[in-house]
Amino acid sequence: MAPPAVLSKSGVIYGKDVKDLFDYAQEKGFAIPAINVTSSSTVVAALEAARDNKAPIILQTSQGGAAYFAGKGVDNKDQAASIAGSIAAAHYIRAIAPTYGIPVVLHTDHCAKKLLPWFDGMLKADEEFFAKTGTPLFSSHMLDLSEETDDENIATCAKYFERMAKMGQWLEMEIGITGGEEDGVNNEHVEKDALYTSPETVFAVYESLHKISPNFSIAAAFGNVHGVYKPGNVQLRPEILGDHQVYAKKQIGTDAKHPLYLVFHGGSGSTQEEFNTAIKNGVVKVNLDTDCQYAYLTGIRDYVTNKIEYLKAPVGNPEGADKPNKKYFDPRVWVREGEKTMSKRIAEALDIFHTKGQL
């Protein structure tokens, strides 16, 4: 497969370009990290890592992250702050991403049933943006109705996908249960057997959504858990993703190696072998949030620890009682330290997922 034109594009991509990127990822055996962003600082940390490693990147806002982007002082009644924050983040990313010279998928993360007003607000913004520009504001959105019955989950996704498909948007949906807790969806106490989706259930999603558009991916559960846990506490079985592909191929009657676009949730703390197996079985996107949050902290933590004597007062430090400390407490200095350590962690992920050097 020849490298698609999307690899040479700069800025936010959508529609056929997103599909071409995911097709190429499956063909070449790599996955794209999806980084949760909550501020302009975390956005540029992710973009910098992708640019420096010649890789595409997915930037996504969660419902809570979007509310934070809007400002914690904004009332989130009826998801107003989350809607405003997501839209603000989208416009910011659209404005700054071309500067970094890489293709960027602009995505939104888990949206549970109780958060659908947030989704509705974003989709309204997409349709308004599309009417003016011919492109949706966001490349893609995710619906996570895994707490509902499979029938309701699939039917609701199909209803929204009908609207999204008119704009060429990509839909990610979750079927089965990812353990742990993630912005509005809490599955910390489910039985372990419930953390594995069956091939029949995954194919039911395909049957419903493929009639509308091929632009969708499935986050099927294979033991995933959000957050980071001690080794042995999480039993991932990424090999069952191959079972989903085989079953779908048989049902469709296709020779395509990977008829399904799959997503790996709860990627923080997983092993290289687990990632390799998942990617081999058609995973094109890996969510990475908790690891990035901690990485961002470490840069700031270490800076404050090492410069503590320069941060106790505006004036006065070990070099003299009259020495100013502005160059040490300026937010641009210590926030930058968090950006650097977050970028480093994303660079590691780009290497692990074989995304590095794909542009």
UniProtKB/Swiss-Prot annotation:
SUPFAM superfamilies: Aldolase. Zn(2+) 1 binds at H110, H226, H265. Signal peptide: none annotated. One of its GO terms (molecular function) is fructose-bisphosphate aldolase activity. It is found in: Cytoplasm. Its main location: cytoplasm. It catalyses: beta-D-fructose 1,6-bisphosphate = D-glyceraldehyde 3-phosphate + dihydroxyacetone phosphate. Pathway: Carbohydrate degradation; glycolysis; D-glyceraldehyde 3-phosphate and glycerone phosphate from D-glucose: step 4/4. Dihydroxyacetone phosphate binds at G227, G266, G267, S268, N287, L288, D289, T290. Binds 2 Zn(2+) ions per subunit. One is catalytic and the other provides a structural contribution. Zn(2+) 2 binds at D144, E174. Its EC number is 4.1.2.13. D-glyceraldehyde 3-phosphate binds at S62. One of its GO terms (biological process) is gluconeogenesis. Its cofactor is Zn(2+). The active site is at D109 (proton donor). Keywords: Allergen, Cytoplasm, Glycolysis, Lyase, Metal-binding, Zinc. NCBIfam families: cbbA, FruBisAldo_II_A, PRK09197.1. Homodimer. Belongs to the class II fructose-bisphosphate aldolase family. Catalyzes the aldol condensation of dihydroxyacetone phosphate (DHAP or glycerone-phosphate) with glyceraldehyde 3-phosphate (G3P) to form fructose 1,6-bisphosphate (FBP) in gluconeogenesis and the reverse reaction in glycolysis. This is Fructose-bisphosphate aldolase. The gene is FBA1.
